[in-house]
Every structure is written in structure tokens, then in C-alpha cells.
Amino acid sequence: MDIKKKIRRKIELYNFKRNHRGLYVDGSLQLRLPKYISCGSNIAIGENSKLLCWDSYNGKKFETSPSIIIESGVRITRNLTIQCANRVQIGDNVLIASDVFIIDYNHGNSPLTKNYRDNPLNISVGGVTIENGVWIGNNVIILPNVTIGEKSIVGAGSVVTKSIPAYSVAVGNPAHVIKHFDFEANIWIED
């Protein structure tokens, strides 16, 4: 990375932290188009994390702007990557473990183009919503058009391809619900 890019990145990170009081971020946080990122208070984002917004691809501007929203009390361990061309919303008091990848769009896959890079991004598939109090385990991948319901747990190594109801435990590739919380018995019950 050349010196101009390093300086620009430091200034961008400084301004981002200044505009979001109560935000702790490691100096290695990478931002792309931070004007599309909003954060609540009392948030910690660990080292080597990336919040990347895309408002165009291959020189074509999208009709809508991307949006990453991180609510208050969120804790992110390290190595989180969010790729956003639509909308990613993370609710209050969410815990995200290491090496999590969240993406809200699909890449085109037509073999009729010269190469896959020339395919347009499909941003109409739907965003990602992680509701309040969710716990995301290590090495989880969250794909577009899903909602992870309030106080749910996603087990380590899971790939979330469809929505997960509130107060559930989901694991696997693809992730599937294995438990739900029974409020009458006050325990987790296997499905």
C-alpha cells in the first residue's frame, strides 16, 4: 500500500470514529464507502474487520444505496467481513465471534460472459437482518435474504442460507434449527 493510501485510510478511520461516539475499533478496520455505514453507541469491532459497501459495480451505479447499520452494544471479536450492496442490519447487543462473513448480494453466474467478473451483481435478492441479542459463532457465513431472529444462536461453522426464527439454535451447512427456547419450562428444547 503506498503512502497516500495509508494516509487516506488513517484519515477515513479517524473521521469514522469521530462521527460515531462510543465506538471502539481496532486500527486495522477497513472501510469502503463509510458514508453508508451507521453505528449506535457502545460498540467494539475487533482487529482485521472489514465493513465494505458497494454502490456500483463495473462502472454501473446501483439504483439504491447500500446500508450497513450496527445498533448499540454490539461486540465483534475479529476478522468480520461485511460485503453490502443492499442492506445489512445488526441489532442491539449482538455478539459476533471471529472470522464471520456476511454478504447481502449474489454475484452473477452466467457462463455466457467472457468471465464471471463481467456478470452483474444481483442486489435484489434481499438484505440481511440480525435481530437483537443474537450470538453468531466462529466461522459463520451469512448469505443474502435472511433474518436471524431475536436471541437466536448460530453455531460455529454454520452457513445461513435461510431465515432462523427467534429464540432458536441453528447449526450446520446449510444451517438448520436444532433447538428452540421453551418459555414455560425456561429451557432449550431439542427439535
What are these regions (language model features)?
Residues N106-G108, T113-K114, V146, H180-F181:
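Conserved catalytic-core motifs of eukaryotic protein kinase domains, centered on the activation segment
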Residues N138, L143-P144, A156:
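Conserved beta-strand->loop/alpha-helix structural units within folded catalytic cores of enzymes
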Residues W135, K151-I153, S158-V159:
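A generic "structured core" feature
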Residues N109-D118, N186-E190:
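Mobile, glycine-enriched helix-loop/loop "lid" segments at the mouths of ligand-binding/catalytic clefts
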Residues V88, G127-V128, N145-V146, T161, ...:
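A short, glycine- and basic residue-enriched loop/turn
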Residues M1-D104, E131-G133, V140, E150, ...:
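Domain-scale signature associated with acetyltransferase and cell-envelope carbohydrate enzymes
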Residues R117-V128:
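A short acidic, glycine-rich active-site loop
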